[in-house]
Amino acid sequence: DLGRARAAVTLPRTRFSSPELAALAQETGRICRRDFDPPQVLSCKGMTTLLFCEKPALRAVFGTAGTAAKGTVSGDAVQQFCSPAAAQMILCDGMGTGRPAAVDGSLAAELTARLLKAGFTAELAARLVNVALALKSDEESGATLDLISVDLYTGTARIFKAGAAPGFLVHGGRARPVGDISLPIGILGGVNGQSRVVHLAAGDYAVLVSDGLLVDGPGWVAKQLELSAAAGDPPEKVARILVETARARAEQTGRPDDITAAVLRLEPCGH
């Protein structure tokens, strides 16, 4: 099943303790030559079914940092979470700055996260969020939508961008920008998003940034990410360094903007 093994065992209704479920997972894994998590237990009409799912090969570690252009209210919003099979990271940038931008950015990010958790694809989630922003008020509303979904069994990563700034992938220690220019959601009847599929491995990073971080272009970001990857920096530190450096550069140019970085690193899952 998409690179992962599943097993089901049905028996007369039985109660199991947590240690017993862990032991059953270990024995089932030995028989199937796979590593399983403790099973989900379903009981109905005198029968009990144990559902075993293979442990993922990877785990995701998240980090985020940000700063507002003025005051403490930022139009950027981040959501980072793991479903049973995938790591999800979302960055939305509300149009403009201040509280109106914060409302749009937060609405887009939170609604996208809920839809992904419910099983919607990125493309369909973007269409629904587009409608929500368009109906929110009579005033023009809009936000960028930037998300990456990483299969924790295979390392396959699906990237979707609508109006978002280029992101970055660090694979094998080399950083490269990802993404082209497209329109935000909420300002047109349709969604002009772009999607692509890449493959990541343990030790790789995925980075989403708002356009305020790229005031001086993407070159310095790629170099910094390669330095951080070589040092094995945790995602929280990577995000903080990017935001602090971008803020210093923005102050020199006199073009302040909301600045946000969201970072995901893949690590081997301990079995």
Predicted regions and their residues:
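Terminal helices and disordered tails flanking the catalytic cores of nucleotide-processing hydrolases
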Residues: D1-A85, L135, E139, L227-D233, ...
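Catalytic core of PPM/PP2C metal-dependent serine/threonine phosphatase domains
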Residues: D1-G3, A23-G46, A102-G172, R247-D257, ...
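Amphipathic coiled-coil signal-relay and dimerization helices
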Residues: A8, A157-K161, R176-G179
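Short, well-ordered beta-strand elements
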Residues: V9, Q88-C92, A206-L208, A262-L264
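Short, glycine-/Ser/Thr-/acidic-enriched flexible segments
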Residues: T14, A69, A85, G96, ...
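PP2C/PPM family metal-dependent serine/threonine protein phosphatase catalytic domain
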Residues: E54-D76, A126, N130-K136, A165-V197, ...
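Cytosolic nucleotide-utilizing catalytic cores of signal-transduction proteins
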Residues: A77, C82-P84, Q88, G96-R99, ...
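Active-site-proximal, acidic helix/loop segment immediately C-terminal to a metal-coordinating Asp/Glu
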Residues: G94-A118, R176, I181-S182, I187-G189, ...
